[in-house]
Amino acid sequence: MKISTTQIERRFEISSSLVGLIDGSFEIGNLFVIVFVSYFGSKLHRPKLIGIGCFLMGTGSILMALPHFFMGYYRYSKETNIDPSENSTSNLPNCLINQMLSLNRTPSEIIERGCVKESGSHMWIYVFMGNMLRGIGETPIVPLGISYIDDFAKEGHSSLYLGTVNVMGMTGLVFAFMLGSLFAKMYVDIGYVDLSTIRITPKDSRWVGAWWLGFLVSGIVSIISSIPFFFLPLNPNKPQKERKVSLFLHVLKTNDKRNQIANLTNRRKYITKNVTGFFQSLKSILTNPLYVIFVIFTLLHMSSYIASLTYIIKMVEQQYGWSASKTNFLLGVLALPAVAIGMFSGGYIIKKFKLSLVGLAKLAFCSATVHLLSQVLYFFLICESKSVAGLTLTYDGNSPVRSHVDVPLSYCNSECNCDESQWEPVCGNNGITYLSPCLAGCKSSSGNKEPIVFYNCSCVEVIGLQNKNYSAHLGECPRDDACTRKSYVYFVIQVLDAFLCAVGLTSYSVLVIRIVQPELKALAIGFHSMIMRSLGGILVPIYFGALIDTTCMKWSTNSCGARGACRIYNSTYLGRAFFGLKVALIFPVLVLLTVFIFVVRKKSHGKDTKVLENERQVMDEANLEFLNDSEHFVPSAEEQ
């Protein structure tokens, strides 16, 4: 989903905040059934539940792709009502002195001609529902799959199998980014229109790749992969001795269940005790200061990563002019392998140096520090906003403007009868981008000859070039060499940041189970996961998207006159706002980790809390002593 966010935003003409809501619908679906799966999953047929989950994920992916087949062809020139299949400059808005534009129709005519064709504008709801269905389907796959492997693998083999699963998962992510890069190069209506008639390129802010193709492929693969799970046994075949023991245990469990059913009164008391014990356990972890601090700083830390993962493609596109295809490719080839290597290295460091609770917290502190420094460095890699006449400059290109709203026309285009809402950018040979050939004052063009060039552009001429052909070519002006160099530095830092932060984040999975009593590990992990999904996975894309929307300088306008997707952002404000909010999230993480380390040192009383297999009891005793000193009562098994 995150690979295609910019494509979906443009195709459905929606804002970044709404795309963030669609992206978070995966976590919403997950939260709907996570309690059911957590409680009933181990009691039901796990392979079949996993198969159902895969099938639901596949169905959801196909549902997300369906709007493409019902929305009609993508019209990238909606503001000008230009048919994208007609690659003719006669349709492009040139300067028409003393003539009325054919586009100056009454609102009723526009609605009559355009709004009917745009009846699919709300079909993003199907993408929302499909992504939610994917979230529902994903819920049983990981927890039940891991427990199934761990329960029935031969002794000593489960780690190998789980490692293989993790490697395959990371390989799948890399493959997904490669496919995303390929599909982003393909035009959205590939196979339906003559591609030679499409005059925009993947670098154009209106370009929409074949976003639907990725969901269609992944949906079909998920449905096919679900089939084998329905034929897996509830209990895989085991050696004869293990089978006899399992049969004996099964008989005992069956008799125990019969006894429970026979005594309904005792069963009601049993349920009541379990419910009471659950709330007592929940109260215990929520009144544990270490756990509360841990939840807060991990939420803040992960929020920064979620924001990067969701909007990194948009950031790179707007800052450095890279296409989504190029960004996806480099992320898949460089950044994701760096994360995988970092996670492996983090696990090795924890095992090699036998890190204590303080050591684990220090490793997390180093991770957060590196991430904070990288965000600070990004401030120096922000490119200046593009020179766009009518947005950052006056239309004659001579003076900057404080606000891009209601920039007055210049004498060079005041008689051209231009529609200022149009977005058909051209690049003048002075290096300035104009919103349309008309607003550049261009009076003639090269016809259908590629590349399309416009001549006699009066606003370009105003710059004062002597003995030059005052022309402009179709498309925005490219970034300068200095900005291009910054883009390469940015990506190098991004890869290093991904690696070093992955090293530190590995410690979080160990910390969460070391700061609570052993019988509360499952509850602590589950509650932490719920907070990460609800306050991180759902909310972060929404409020970061809303922040990004505030930096938009030019919104598209659909044929009904409503606001669509953003065409161009103020890259300077965008970079400062995006990285500034990330710094605001990460800095408190360092403060809370410092407090965390101080509290652990103060309460541990010099106990050796190293993560050693032969010293696990010593570590647990130290943790229990800390919890008891803090007066955090946890109901015992008998009391529950």
From Swiss-Prot:
Gene3D superfamilies: 3.30.60.30, MFS general substrate transporter like domains. The modification Phosphoserine is found at residues 246, 636. Residues 38-49, 145-159, 233-292, 351-362, 514-521, 599-640 are cytoplasmic. One of its GO terms (molecular function) is bile acid transmembrane transporter activity. The keyword Cell membrane applies. One of its GO terms (biological process) is sodium-independent organic anion transport. Keywords: Cell membrane, Disulfide bond, Membrane, Phosphoprotein, Protease inhibitor, Serine protease inhibitor, Transmembrane, Transmembrane helix. This is Putative solute carrier organic anion transporter family member 1B7. It comes from Homo sapiens (Human).
